[in-house]
A protein has these predicted regions:
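Acidic, small-polar-rich N-terminal luminal/periplasmic segments of exported/outer-membrane proteins
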Residues: 39-188, 559
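Gram-negative outer-membrane beta-barrel transporters
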Residues: 37-39, 396, 461-462, 569, ...
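Face-selective signature of the C-terminal outer-membrane beta-barrel domain
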Residues: 322-355, 370-485, 507, 564, ...
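Conserved C-terminal beta-signal and adjacent last beta-strands/turns
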Residues: 6-8, 19-22, 505, 516, ...
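Membrane-embedded beta-barrel scaffold of Gram-negative outer-membrane proteins
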Residues: 330-334, 340-346, 352-356, 507, ...
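Acidic/polar loop-and-plug regions of large Gram-negative outer-membrane beta-barrel proteins
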Residues: 249-251, 256-328, 355-374, 423-433, ...
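Outer-membrane beta-barrel translocator/receptor signature
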Residues: 139-141, 153-157, 162, 166-245, ...
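Structural signature of Gram-negative outer-membrane beta-barrels, strongest in the C-terminal barrel
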Residues: 381, 393-396, 404-406, 441-579, ...
Length: 768
């Protein structure tokens, strides 16, 4: 029996060579594009992502001038968090954002979840420098997490549109909003940065960046990160990662070419999912059996001790391994005074494994695998895309046309490896040298996305009124091929030739404005472990090949007002969203048990809510930021499952808190800075019938820092202390609603993650 080999990202792949050749080619045509110094200055084009990164301090954090609800994170916001914190966690201070994780810095991907206005992470759009990151799910099939895509310090700007994303966003999953990240540009002068973070759970993180400075329009930086920590619970379960980022900019005239490269390797001990029953019987800190191998063997053989009641209460150990390489080549060219071309080509390669000891005997046909084999889920992604936009400034109109095309080839397979004569693995779980015992499943997918859009932005009444008229055409074809385990083959297409988006903003005066927007969108059918075809061919044939399955769609309308003064800024927005043909996974087993989940169309979901934000800056020393959101998301229909009807009409959507509140107080004086952050999240349900829920909670974090300024040859030296979960609150953080069920009467559904205890981190940073 053979196993398909998915290689780790190569050190210098052919794709990177092609991108570098393309970069040189673009540089060679610069003399033919560069504007004549003697001609009049051209009309200023809209700020590009990189330009926005350079001028974030001048951009409204409440989205002043936008026709949609938009919120931004500033560099001051980021400083309230420890170095190395996931950029997603920083977003939790914004209205409508629910971010959860099981570790203090939000880095462990198995426990990461984010939702906006009742839309889970699978139904949002994410980009880095305009390039799609897929849906950032744990078992990703079309992208990668932002933590693997870029080192946190190299992010210059983060923007959240919680309900209606920009029409040109390169995403085929953004039914409920977008999150856009922008990488920082190389600095104009030579500099070197180094920081070292030490903290709870043996955390050690080193960050380094060197900027070349700008020479004749050419500038660059190279940056690296090394992270090493133990999971906060369990026995010496490491969470390690290494990353390298590099960026090159070449500016000539009013034109720019940039190349961004990222390589990352993550080896993480997963945090196990628990149930209400496990927490009650075995405690908040329950984890893997590691290093007690005899207890794991006994449990697999039905001999239970210390409150354990089933083999599924724990496994011996589990890990996730991910290797990624991302390359982005972008060019922005002023073709004439009124015509701007922006073009991007990118490539992403991922190879990954999720390895876990399997505490059950596996039997399939004539194959029997003894308990405590290693269950290995193997992932592979190879995607390439091209996107471009052409913007024409015609009087009071800004007309933009753009397209995006992406080819995404991804694989998912699951194997069992026999550990009968092997030494138990107490740290990172790997399958090297172990005999392959069974192929549980093997599938490959080929997804092709094509998207075209047209936008007209019209300003009038002395620029007080701005109108936007947009429309896009999108189609994604997903083809599955079953290779092993009896898994299915088939094809689905999601297509809509006309998805409109309209919006308006009106300036009442220099401080106040009102805005409104309406949008329709459609999501592609997912691939990999989230695909309707991720089951046996027999099950697919019983559903007539899913020929009647409809893609998920949404219609959103929002209305709001903003005020921005020197003393304070405030915004308020109300919204209504109808989400049709919502597809949910129905778990047929719990925990790590191998089985096929079902897919149900639960009809429509209606989401209504209110979002408020208020920021007060009484003087240069104090800043008080607040956000509040109320959301009411319910299922509009019952659904059929297993020949019966599940009564969910009127029930609250899983993992959707009705009320969230965030308050952040920041102080700085001379060389000192300090901050206190508080977050509240109300009760959340984790079953479709709402028979089971987790309680709401308050969390507090704090930070303190000192800037020594110039010390000898060092331009700047800083030290900071960050406290996470200041009052050591016990709470349920992540709900793995990918494995939700209709009900959980016995409390045995293993989809709960407990939150991290109080943690502390100290960072020393220097700049040359």
């Amino acid at each position: 029996m053979s196993i398909r080999s998915i290689p780790r990202a190569s050190r210098f792949p052919v794709t990177r060579l092609a991108l570098l050749i393309s970069l040189n080619s673009l540089c060679l045509i610069s003399p033919f594009i560069q504007a004549d110094d003697n001609v009049p200055a051209p009309v200023t084009p809209p700020a590009s992502d990189d330009a926005a990164a350079m001028t974030l301090g001048t951009v409204s954090v409440i989205g002043q001038g936008e026709t949609r609800q938009v919120q931004r994170v500033t560099q001051k916001d980021v400083k309230a968090y420890s170095a190395g914190t996931s950029p997603m966690k920083v977003l939790q201070r914004l209205p409508g954002v629910n971010f959860q994780s099981g570790d203090p810095l939000g880095r462990e991907e198995g426990s990461q979840r984010i939702s906006l206005r009742g839309f889970d992470m699978h139904h949002l759009g994410y980009t880095l420098d305009g390039v799609t990151l897929g849906n950032m799910s744990f078992g990703n099939f079309n992208g990668l997490s932002i933590t693997r895509a870029i080192i946190a310090e190299n992010i210059a700007a983060s923007e959240v549109a919680p309900g209606i994303g920009s029409l040109g966003t390169a995403s085929n999953s953004d039914l409920g909003g977008t999150i856009q990240f922008t990488s920082s540009n190389p600095e104009k002068e030579f500099s070197a940065q180094l920081s070292q973070t030490m903290g709870s759970y043996d955390t050690s993180r080193t960050f380094m960046r060197v900027d070349t400075g700008e020479y004749n329009g050419l500038s660059a930086y190279v940056s690296g990160e090394k992270y090493d920590a133990d999971a906060w619970k369990g026995h010496n379960n490491p969470q390690k990662s290494d990353a390298v980022n590099a960026k090159v900019n070449y500016n000539f005239g009013d034109n720019r070419v940039s190349f961004f490269h990222s390589t990352s390797s993550h080896d993480e001990a997963n945090l196990p999912s628990l149930s209400q029953s496990i927490i009650q019987r075995l405690g908040y800190n329950w984890s893997y059996y590691t290093p007690d191998w005899p207890r794991a063997v006994n449990a697999a053989n039905g001999i239970y001790t210390g409150g354990v009641t089933s083999a599924g209460d724990a496994t011996y150990n589990a890990s996730s391994l991910r290797d990624d390489e991302l390359d982005i080549l972008n060019g922005n060219f002023s073709l004439t005074d009124d015509l701007v071309l922006d073009a991007t080509v990118y490539h992403h390669h991922d190879s990954g494994r999720g390895n876990s000891y399997y505490p059950f005997i596996y039997t399939s046909g004539a194959t029997t695998v003894p308990s405590n084999a290693i269950r290995s889920t193997v992932y592979g992604i190879d995607r390439t895309g091209f996107q471009s936009s052409l913007t024409y400034f015609l009087g009071q109109h800004e007309i933009q046309a753009g397209f995006w095309i992406q080819s995404n080839k991804n694989d998912i397979a699951r194997y069992l490896f026999d550990t009968t004569n092997a030494t138990p693995q107490n740290h990172i779980v790997k399958t090297n040298g172990l005999p392959l015992a069974a192929t549980v499943l093997d599938q490959s997918y080929n997804d092709l996305t094509r998207q075209f859009y047209l936008r007209d932005t019209y300003t009038l009444l002395d620029d007080r009124l701005k109108l936007e008229f947009d429309a896009k055409n999108t189609v994604t074809t997903s083809t599955a091929k079953g290779k092993g385990g009896g898994y299915a083959s088939g094809s689905l297409e999601a297509r809509d030739r006309f998805l409109p988006q309209v919006g308006a903003t009106y300036k009442l005066n220099d401080s106040d404005e009102v805005f409104t927007s309406y949008s329709e969108n459609m999501a592609a059918f997912p691939s990999g472990g989230y695909s309707p075809f991720f089951t046996t061919q027999t099950a697919v044939d019983a559903q007539n090949g899913f020929r009647d399955l409809k893609p998920e769609t949404s219609k959103t309308v929002e209305l709001g007002l903003r005020r921005s003064t020197q003393l304070y800024s405030a915004s308020a927005a109300v919204y209504n969203t109808r989400f049709d043909n919502r597809l949910v996974a129905i778990t047929n087993c719990t925990g790590i048990v191998i089985c096929q989940n079902g897919v149900a169309n639960v009809g429509s979901v209606t989401s209504r809510g209110l979002e408020l934000s208020f920021g007060l800056t009484p003087n240069e020393n104090w800043r008080w930021s607040n956000s509040m959101s109320y959301n009411h998301s319910t299922y509009d229909d019952d659904y059929a499952s297993g020949g019966s009807t599940v009564q969910v009409k009127g029930k609250t959507v899983v993992d959707t808190p009705k009320l969230m509140y965030s308050s952040n107080l920041d102080w700085n004086r001379e060389r000192w800075n300090a901050g206190l952050q508080g977050n509240y999240i109300s009760k959340r349900y984790y079953t479709y019938t709402n028979d089971s829920s987790v309680s709401g909670y308050w969390l507090a974090n704090a930070n303190l820092g000192y800037d020594f300024g110039k010390l000898g040859a060092l331009k700047d030296t800083t030290v900071s202390l960050n406290m996470v979960n200041l009052f050591d609150k016990r709470y349920i953080s992540t709900l793995n609603t990918d494995a939700s069920a209709a009900a959980d009467p016995s409390g045995n559904l293993q989809i709960l993650q407990v939150g991290t205890p109080r943690s502390a981190f100290v960072t020393l940073g220097v700049k040359l």
